[in-house]
């Protein structure tokens, strides 16, 4: 039977589950699916049987790599959930799922509190204005501390948590929660079978004072935000539960507060109240309102599309995956209008028409066919040939382009050499399909060695991609050691550089003259744009049809830097002037002139080498602190802070990625296996001269 999407959008929630790698996100999602009736048997992550983790590598590693989408129902409401990965190498999956969500559940480990990846994901959610509720998970774990975790939400995220539930007991004695809205205990005592109903009781005597204190804080916070409620609160009048709920909903949707719940997903405790909160407090598509885009023919004209089936169709493709039977699946969020199976849509990003073969709502990797895709929902489309992540699909009669996504450049690379000619052919297919799925997985040819070089966001990212090539595409290949993705940039402006491209042989010749200026370019915070081109030519001295060719030539030359052939970034190029010839000028001539002008200008602009710097966090017992800091310093790291956390010391530092290979082994041997660390890409920084000269010499065969 086809699963039809709810047409009343007020009863729809598009949410993500987001967290640090081991906070229990996937288990939480599995329990949601069980309690909402989708799963009859619950899969455990540590058994490799989890429904949402459907790739072989995910089942083996016990982590979520891709964002599986699924649909379920709770109390007459439809919840479309995306389970996102918690490992830093897969932040792109988080980023693109947040782009299409209306709300999220942030899951925290009750012992660890806010961890580095939690901070990263939280920042990404803030970037896309995604309202959140918090679920403090693993309350049954040794060392679980709800109040500590809530404090870390304040200290590390700078957020305003609104405590909605208090734990009853902790660790093995965790039995339930105090529901602060209704002032009652909600318990699941002893070993709770999956699917067991909660019991509602009086609040335990030893928790009554604390419950009163937190209830008072809750009411006060909510009342402060509304003049009428505040007057009634100070007059001693009672504010009803429904009034509190309505105001908490407003505050949550505007990201002024973040309601906090707690439980143990693994022990089946606390899931139902959290699901109620998803419905009560997270926005529906109507709350989010119109999506912004621009006219497909004129980027300056803003277009708004309401979440209504009566509007023209518009949707954003946010993920591409390969399904074992159907081939290419394109995950799509529909923002307005609707489209039927077999219908034709326009990919306005690529200006190509696409026909929809089949439409599904997904439950992890199991598909449920639907006849129509409607506004406010998430679907998988089959049959789209040219659509990739970030593309807009729309009505061909009313084209629009929705705001797309920026994807970061890779920070790590490996060379790959197929073992046989047959492997070479299979490798080409594998790379094309995997790059379609993941825009942060890149491929290039090293002109000097002739090797194929794969790029990604970290060692695990590339491990998984290479593993998939072997398993899914049967590619046998030798893999080189990981290499750092260095970049080059300039430090000094060049006010004017003239270059003339001139070639005269028999027949028509080639002629193009360009005068360019070059200067360092500072990208806006949060932007992945690393280049800007400005045209200041007047009076038609370079005809306008040749201007894009100059830009293209400059961008081509930026792929291969001056010092050691690494890509050039953070450059602003201005075309000041030029000249052309009626017969001999062409697009190609101006492209070559732009390319050569950039190379000559960079040589005069004090080029420098850049390297990826990682934000590293080490958690270590105090007695090893000196060793850990000494080791970080020896790796050219800069320690930024030292804090206490749960009886251990936390060292935060920025360290070049090139110095971090093999770090986990060194750290374990220095600390008798008692320390651990995490790292996230932070930024690119200039390589010190002595180190840079070695890198350049190695790259250029000693000609530094």
UniProtKB/Swiss-Prot annotation:
Cited InterPro entries: EFG_II, EFG_III, EFG_III/V, EFG_IV, EFG_V, EFG_V-like, EFTu-like_2, G_TR_CS
Keywords for the protein's UniProt record, in alphabetical order: Cytoplasm, Elongation factor, GTP-binding, Nucleotide-binding, Protein biosynthesis
Protein biosynthesis recorded as keyword: yes
Predominant location: cytoplasm
Location within or outside the cell: Cytoplasm
Pfam families: EFG_C (PF00679), EFG_III (PF14492), EFG_IV (PF03764), GTP_EFTU (PF00009), GTP_EFTU_D2 (PF03144)
Transmembrane region(s): none
Binding site residues for GTP: 19-26, 83-87, 137-140
Entry's Gene Ontology cellular component terms: cytoplasm
Domain tr-type G: 10-286
GO molecular function, one term: translation elongation factor activity
A single BP term in Gene Ontology: ribosome disassembly
Entries under SUPFAM superfamilies matching the protein: EF-G C-terminal domain-like, P-loop containing nucleoside triphosphate hydrolases, Ribosomal protein S5 domain 2-like, Translation proteins
SMART domains assigned: EFG_C (SM00838), EFG_IV (SM00889)
Family assignment from sequence similarity: Belongs to the TRAFAC class translation factor GTPase superfamily. Classic translation factor GTPase family. EF-G/EF-2 subfamily.
HAMAP family, alphabetized: EF_G_EF_2_B (MF_00054_B)
PANTHER family reported for this sequence: RIBOSOME-RELEASING FACTOR 2, MITOCHONDRIAL, TRANSLATION ELONGATION FACTOR G-RELATED
Task performed by this protein: Catalyzes the GTP-dependent ribosomal translocation step during translation elongation. During this step, the ribosome changes from the pre-translocational (PRE) to the post-translocational (POST) state as the newly formed A-site-bound peptidyl-tRNA and P-site-bound deacylated tRNA move to the P and E sites, respectively. Catalyzes the coordinated movement of the two tRNA molecules, the mRNA and conformational changes in the ribosome.
Protein name as catalogued: Elongation factor G
Gene symbol of the encoding locus: fusA
């Amino acid at each position: 039977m086809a699963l039809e999407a709810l047409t009343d959008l007020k009863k729809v929630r598009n949410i993500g589950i987001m967290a640090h790698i081991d906070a229990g996100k996937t288990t939480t999602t599995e329990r949601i699916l069980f309690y909402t009736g989708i799963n009859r048997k619950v899969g455990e992550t540590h058994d490799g049987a989890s429904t949402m983790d459907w790739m072989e590598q995910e089942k083996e590693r016990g982590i979520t790599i891709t964002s599986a989408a699924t649909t379920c129902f709770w109390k007459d409401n439809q919840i479309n959930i995306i389970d996102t990965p918690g490992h830093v190498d897969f932040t792109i999956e988080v980023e693109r799922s947040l782009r299409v969500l209306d709300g999220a559940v942030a899951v925290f480990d009750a012992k660890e509190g806010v961890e580095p990846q939690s901070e990263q994901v939280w920042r990404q959610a803030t970037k896309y204005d995604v309202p959140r509720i918090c679920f403090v998970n693993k309350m049954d774990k040794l060392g679980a501390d709800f109040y500590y975790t809530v404090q870390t939400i304040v200290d590390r995220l700078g957020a305003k948590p609104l405590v909605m539930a208090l734990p009853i007991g902790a660790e093995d004695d965790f039995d339930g929660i105090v529901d602060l809205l209704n002032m009652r205990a909600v318990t699941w005592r002893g070993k709770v079978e999956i699917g067991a109903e909660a019991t509602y009781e009086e609040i335990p005597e030893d928790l009554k004072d604390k419950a009163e204190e937190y209830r008072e804080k809750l009411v006060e916070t909510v009342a402060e935000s509304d003049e009428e409620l505040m007057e009634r609160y100070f007059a001693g009048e009672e504010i009803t539960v429904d009034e509190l709920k309505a105001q908490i909903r407003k505050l949550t949707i505007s990201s002024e507060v973040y309601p906090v719940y707690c439980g143990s997903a693994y022990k089946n405790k606390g899931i139902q109240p959290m699901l109620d909160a998803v419905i009560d407090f997270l926005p529906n598509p109507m709350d989010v309102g119109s999506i912004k885009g621009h006219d497909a023919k004129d980027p300056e004209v803003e277009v708004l599309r309401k979440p209504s089936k009566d509007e023209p169709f518009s949707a954003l493709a946010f993920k591409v995956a390969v399904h074992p039977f159907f081939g290419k699946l394109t995950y799509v969020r529909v923002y307005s209008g609707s489209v039927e199976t077999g219908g034709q849509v326009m990919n306005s990003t690529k200006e190509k028409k696409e026909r929809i073969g089949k439409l599904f709502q997904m439950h992890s990797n199991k598909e449920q066919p639907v006849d129509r895709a409607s506004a406010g929902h998430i679907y998988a489309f089959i049959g789209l040939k040219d659509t990739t992540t970030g593309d807009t699909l729309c009505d061909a009669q009313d084209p629009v382009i929705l705001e797309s996504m920026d994807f970061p450049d890779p920070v790590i690379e490996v060379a790959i050499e197929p073992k046989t000619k047959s492997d070479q052919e299979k490798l080409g297919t594998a790379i094309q399909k995997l790059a379609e799925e993941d825009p942060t997985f890149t491929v290039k040819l090293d002109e000097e060695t002739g090797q194929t070089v794969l790029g990604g966001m970290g060692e695990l990212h590339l491990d998984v991609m290479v593993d998939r090539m072997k398993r899914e595409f049967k590619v046998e290949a030798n893999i080189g050691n990981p290499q750092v993705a260095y970049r080059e940039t300039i430090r000094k402006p060049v006010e004017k550089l003239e270059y003339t491209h001139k070639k005269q042989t028999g027949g028509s010749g080639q002629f193009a003259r360009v005068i360019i200026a070059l200067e360092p370019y500072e990208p806006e915070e949060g932007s992945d744009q690393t280049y800007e081109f400005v045209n200041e030519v007047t009076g038609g001295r370079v005809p306008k049809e040749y201007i894009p060719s100059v830009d293209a030539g400059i961008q081509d030359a930026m792929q291969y830097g001056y010092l050691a052939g690494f890509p050039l970034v953070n450059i602003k190029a201005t075309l000041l002037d030029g000249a052309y010839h009626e017969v001999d000028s062409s697009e190609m001539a101006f492209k070559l002139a732009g390319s050569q002008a950039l190379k000559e200008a960079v040589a005069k602009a004090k080029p420098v080498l850049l390297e990826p710097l990682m934000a590293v966090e080490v958690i270590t017992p105090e007695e090893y602190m000196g060793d850990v800091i000494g080791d970080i310093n020896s790796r050219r790291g800069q320690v930024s802070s030292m804090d206490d956390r749960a009886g251990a010391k936390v060292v935060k530092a920025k360290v070049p990625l090139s110095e971090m290979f093999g770090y986990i082994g060194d750290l374990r041997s220095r600390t008798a296996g008692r320390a651990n660390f995490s790292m996230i890409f932070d930024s690119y920084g200039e390589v010190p001269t002595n180190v840079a000269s070695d890198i350049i010499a190695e790259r250029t065969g000693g000609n530094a």
